């Protein structure tokens, strides 16, 4: 008869226990028809904007999610995307599409609309220009880069990570004692933005960082 060491048996029991603890964690596929994007979400269903419940297609099991009932999801009335919250309301995840990133873009994204927006929000317009545009806005303002720069300007020293690419940007910062992660992608096909944003407490950082990476990497458009 084969004998097993106490160390091996302890490891086996702990592994088995862990598998039971995380057995219910699943990702499901959410498809947004309005903006034509797909993302894996940590819930099996969502409430739509007219009071109904929609079941989502299974994507995969995951040990990143403690239980399938940890989150609840709601689709906006205009069908642009989902708001996902944990049962305590400490974690908020947004995934949505939009044709505009800010009011300046809605109003034409010109020097005048930007100046007016900064004055309304009591932001230092001249300092912003000096820091990001060498004191003068270009004639053709890149809306994605502008929004990225404005976020960097607003959150300043609270920014922990930031990067920008050809059709996306990522920024992570601290706001009201919460970690905020935001990724914005421009879809050339739909001529719209796909926005992912998650905010959570530092105590949830260990599992939420991994959850965010999983969700962001699953976005297709």
Positions of predicted regions on the chain:
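Proline-anchored loop/turn motifs at beta-strand termini and strand-loop-strand connectors
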Residues: 32-64, 68
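Residues that flank catalytic or metal-binding motifs in active/ligand-binding sites
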Residues: 35, 41, 78-80, 215
């Amino acid at each position: 008869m084969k004998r097993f060491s106490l160390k091996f048996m302890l490891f086996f029991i702990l592994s088995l226990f862990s598998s039971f603890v995380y057995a219910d964690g699943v990702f499901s596929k959410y498809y947004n028809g309005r903006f034509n994007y797909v993302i894996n979400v940590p819930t099996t269903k969502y409430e739509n904007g007219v009071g109904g419940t929609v079941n989502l297609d299974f994507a995969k099991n995951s040990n990143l999610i403690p239980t399938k009932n940890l989150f609840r999801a709601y689709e906006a009335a205009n069908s642009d995307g989902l708001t996902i919250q944990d049962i305590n309301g400490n974690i908020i995840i947004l995934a949505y599409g939009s044709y505009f990133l800010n009011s300046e873009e809605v109003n034409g994204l010109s020097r005048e609309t930007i100046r007016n927006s900064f004055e309304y929000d009591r932001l230092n317009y001249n300092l912003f220009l000096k820091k990001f545009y060498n004191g003068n806005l270009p004639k053709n303002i890149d809306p994605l880069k502008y929004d990225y720069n404005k976020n960097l300007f607003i959150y300043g020293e609270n920014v922990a990570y930031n990067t920008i690419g050809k059709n996306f940007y990522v920024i992570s910062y601290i706001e009201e004692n919460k970690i905020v992660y935001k990724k914005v992608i421009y879809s050339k096909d739909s001529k719209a933005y796909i926005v992912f944003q998650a905010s959570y407490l530092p105590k949830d950082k260990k599992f939420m960082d991994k959850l965010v990476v999983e969700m962001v990497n699953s976005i297709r458009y």
